[in-house]
Structures are given as C-alpha cells and as structure tokens.
C-alpha cells in the first residue's frame, strides 16, 4: 500500500518553503477549511518554513504587570477590566525598584527580553505617570545593559510614541486581538480597533519594532482568524503573539468552550505560512489550556514563547521553559 499523497492545497502551499514568499488569502482560507486529519501535514510544512525562513532558535520573553486592574475598557476576556468581576490584585504603577528586581531576575535566568505592561486604555499624551515609565526604561538600560526592554502600555499618541522610540525599546506590544471587522462584537466597544492599528503605524513610523497579534477562542471562526492574519500582514508587524483564551471567572467569556485542537494547530501553522519570516510567539494558554500539546504547537510554526507568567495568571517556571527550548532545538 503506497503512501497517501498530500492534499493538493497543502502541496501547493509548499511554494512557501521554496521561495519564502507567503501564501495568499484564498490559499489560507482553503487550508483553514481542511478537516482535522490534515492538520499535522500543514503543521509539518509550517515547521519546515520556520526552520528555513524564520529567525532561528526559540525567542523567549518575560513580562511584568506593572499596573494592575481598574481598566475602563470592556474587553470581554480580560480580568483587569472594571466592567468585569474577576478577583485579581489591583495596584497602581509600581516603583522603579520593583521593576528592576523583576528584570534582574530575567537576566539571571537567561531571558533576553523583558516587557513592562500596564493596564488601562493607554497614554495619548505625556503625563507624570508616563514620565515615570520612561524613567524605569532609562534605569533598566543603565543597570542591565544586556537586557532588551519592551513595553505594552496601550494606545499611544504622537508624542508618547516618539518618546518611547527615543528610549530605544526593543519591541512595543499592542494586539488587534481578532479580525478588525469583528473587534467591537468579540472584544470591546469602549474603543475602536483602529486606535490600536494607528498606534502600530505611529510606532513603525518612529522606527519601533512592533509585537502585535491576537487571541483565539473568543467566538471567532477559522475564516476570522485568516482575516486577522492578513490584517497583521498589512500592518507589517515584527512579532506576532498568539494567545489561546484562558477563561477567567468573572469575565463574559468565563464559560467559553475550548477550541478543537486541530483548529489551534491549523491557526498556528497557517499563521507561519502567511508570515514566513516573522517571529510567531505562543503566549497565553500554552501551559493551562494546551498542557500536553504545547510542544506540538511549538512544532507547528511558532518560534517564540512567553515565559515565567502572565498578567493575572501563573505560567511555567523559566527553568522548565529553558529546558523545553533546548529540546525543541533538535527539530530545527
């Protein structure tokens, strides 16, 4: 009995491996529609594309929740929104020493990138609080020169974007979360996704590398995920984090059903085929939702991970992830 051939749509997508050029929207939609039995074939191609055209190795970063809760936006998945009723720790912006302590721990554990994250809509204009964050960044650069400092502070304006660019941050994170056409329905209606997209454009015009992706499992369909992939391609972001929803008690999505595993695998793999040369990062849901299958997703096109914990939920120990990254290297 001969080996069954690849599905024609998957065979056609092998052009990405040869040329490094991404697949188009129609091809991505065709792959997204294939049944689960083809998921591992798509994943295998995505892993080959990552190895040939990606940045090499597995990028790791860690974040600190430097200001927690009492956010006025109504994001349906988020424990930090004051519209929701989650039991989380709430505190104002921490001091520089607290940030330095966390950042030094990252350096000691071999994590190269460290992100300062704050709750809230963002900083359209310069403020005392924003100046404090700039001072934190300056101190990290001064005392930990090997550390790549990142930030995720919400929506920015021209002055605040320019100020961050002047501080030489490695990446700025702001996610579009879902396909822009369904943002108000699936994520939040207290602000528009265009405000986030304009922040990406502002930062890129100022020479800042942008980390921008989304979340899956919030009620979207595979077709919606493909549309998000192409919105990200139009924005030309550098790093693409993919979060798998971790339902949190007290949020509107606390009872959201788990996604079928084959859909998650296809989402990661097709993202790689649409973005063959970008860093694709597995963020939330890696340990808590995917559990035994997290390694499979890291072999489905992803080449980055968030380590050491998330904003309001625990992650895996950095030492465990360091061993995990070393094991993944054998597939490169």
From Swiss-Prot:
Enzyme class: transferase
Chain sites annotated for binding [4Fe-4S] cluster: 71, 75, 78
Cofactor: [4Fe-4S] cluster; [2Fe-2S] cluster
E.C. number: 2.8.1.6
SUPFAM superfamilies linked: Radical SAM enzymes
Keywords: 2Fe-2S, 4Fe-4S, Biotin biosynthesis, Iron, Iron-sulfur, Metal-binding, S-adenosyl-L-methionine, Transferase
Record-listed [2Fe-2S] cluster binding positions: 150, 211, 281
Cofactor comment text: Binds 1 [4Fe-4S] cluster. The cluster is coordinated with 3 cysteines and an exchangeable S-adenosyl-L-methionine. Binds 1 [2Fe-2S] cluster. The cluster is coordinated with 3 cysteines and 1 arginine.
GO biological process, one term: biotin biosynthetic process
Source species, domain of life: Bacteria
GO molecular function: 2 iron, 2 sulfur cluster binding; 4 iron, 4 sulfur cluster binding; biotin synthase activity; iron ion binding
CDD domains: Radical_SAM
Pathway: Cofactor biosynthesis; biotin biosynthesis; biotin from 7,8-diaminononanoate: step 2/2
Radical SAM core domain sequence ranges: 53-283
Catalytic activity annotation: (4R,5S)-dethiobiotin + (sulfur carrier)-SH + 2 reduced [2Fe-2S]-[ferredoxin] + 2 S-adenosyl-L-methionine = (sulfur carrier)-H + biotin + 2 5'-deoxyadenosine + 2 L-methionine + 2 oxidized [2Fe-2S]-[ferredoxin]
Coiled coil: none
Stored NCBIfam families: bioB
Family: Belongs to the radical SAM superfamily. Biotin synthase family.
UniProt subunit comment: Homodimer.
Biological role: Catalyzes the conversion of dethiobiotin (DTB) to biotin by the insertion of a sulfur atom into dethiobiotin via a radical-based mechanism.
Protein name: Biotin synthase
Organism in which the protein naturally occurs: Chlorobium luteolum (strain DSM 273 / BCRC 81028 / 2530) (Pelodictyon luteolum)
